[in-house]
């Protein structure tokens, strides 16, 4: 059987783009156990409460829920265990410097398969206040309305 190519999405954290201003994104590998891989192959995971933390020069992913594999036995994994992320040393050092500035955090954006390996996209992000969220929603709605008006104009329908 040939290896799968491309990028196949497993889970996405849509809430993160609403709650945070995304400054930079990174792709990282994950250290997983066998039953976790099988659960991910079934397309089951949740990134909603997830975050990444740096300790001892390593990046750890916390609170990402990968449910137990239904066919697993006593060797099954804990659903919310912390998982090590694989990044280049230079990327880790850059992230250490930026997260220590204050106000910045690492949040997972998406979990996907890339060439048969589980990858996670993490973002260096700054939390938004509630008024910033409302402002972003208003801007998005205005842009959508402008796009609709331009589309009607292009089709020859005014109003």
From Swiss-Prot:
Classification via InterPro entries: SmpB (IPR023620), SsrA-bd_prot (IPR000037), SsrA-bd_prot_CS (IPR020081)
Q: Which PROSITE patterns match?
A: SSRP
Its main localization is cytoplasm
What Gene3D superfamilies does the record point to? 2.40.280.10
Q: Which Pfam families match?
A: SmpB (PF01668)
- Per the record, the domain of life is Bacteria
Question: One GO BP annotation here?
Answer: trans-translation
Report keywords, A-Z. Cytoplasm, RNA-binding
Localization: Cytoplasm
What is a single cellular component term in the Gene Ontology annotation?
cytosol
Where do the TM regions start and end?
none
Q: Which CDD domains match?
A: SmpB
Parts forming coiled coils: none
Record GO terms (molecular function) = RNA binding
Function field: Required for rescue of stalled ribosomes mediated by trans-translation. Binds to transfer-messenger RNA (tmRNA), required for stable association of tmRNA with ribosomes. tmRNA and SmpB together mimic tRNA shape, replacing the anticodon stem-loop with SmpB. tmRNA is encoded by the ssrA gene; the 2 termini fold to resemble tRNA(Ala) and it encodes a 'tag peptide', a short internal open reading frame. During trans-translation Ala-aminoacylated tmRNA acts like a tRNA, entering the A-site of stalled ribosomes, displacing the stalled mRNA.
Q: Which NCBIfam families match?
A: PRK05422.1, smpB
Q: What protein family is recorded?
A: Belongs to the SmpB family.
Protein's name in the database: SsrA-binding protein
Q: Which gene encodes it?
A: smpB
């Amino acid at each position: 059987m040939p290896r799968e190519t491309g990028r196949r999405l497993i889970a996405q954290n849509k809430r993160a783009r609403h709650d945070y201003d995304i400054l930079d994104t990174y792709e990282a590998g994950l250290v997983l156990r066998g039953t976790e891989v099988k659960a991910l192959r079934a397309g089951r995971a949740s990134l909603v409460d997830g975050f990444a933390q740096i300790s001892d020069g390593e990046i750890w992913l916390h609170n990402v829920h990968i449910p137990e594999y239904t066919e697993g036995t006593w060797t099954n994994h804990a659903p919310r265990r912390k998982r090590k992320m694989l990044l280049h040393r230079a990327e880790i050092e850059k992230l250490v410097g930026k997260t220590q500035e204050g106000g910045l955090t690492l949040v997972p954006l998406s979990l996907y398969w890339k060439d048969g390996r589980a990858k996670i996209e993490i973002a260096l992000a700054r939390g938004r206040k509630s008024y910033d969220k409302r402002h972003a929603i208003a801007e998005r709605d205005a842009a959508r309305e402008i796009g609709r008006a331009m589309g009607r104009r292009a089709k020859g329908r005014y109003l």
